[in-house]
Amino acid sequence: MPFEPPATRNYKKHFSSHKANLDPIEGVWTEYAVGTLSEDGKVIQRKEIQKRASWIIIKNKGEYQVLNEYGEQNKFIASFTRTSQKNAYMFNAFYFESKDHIKVEAILVNGNRLEMAYDAPPGVFEENYREILDTIHIQDPDKKLTLHWQFNWLKSFPND
């Protein structure tokens, strides 16, 4: 059996004992992602990442807080809030180091899949992909790179 952090186990216990009162977005989620790197509008690389991360979503004072599998928010503060549309949420994230802010709509599909997509903000892109940027900028400093992320979060707990 794979290692499960104590925080994830504890949140699973919480979700189990409060299952009747949970909102559909609350639970443990596994992130899958497709990143598309473009240079001056042309795709140069596309990468699919299975099980990129594990997230815990729990209601906290009118919003849904996003925690990593250890129950922390160590690189960014993130949350979902309801919108006026059914099954639609606004994802908000603030990255500590780069000071970038992401705000994008996320759709809950069939109660067990969250879908969202956005271009990585410049600071987050540079922070995580500096070696790619350095290589390309040495070759041609005028080239413009963008990284578009498509995310699917699949609910792993609780299952209906």
Q: Where are the predicted features?
A:
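Amphipathic/hydrophobic helical signal segments and adjacent flexible N-terminal regions
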Residues: 1-38, 126-160
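Central antiparallel beta-sheet cores of small beta-barrel/beta-sandwich binding domains
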Residues: 15-19, 23-26, 30-109
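A charged, solvent-exposed segment within the mature domains of Sec-exported extracytoplasmic proteins
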Residues: 86-160
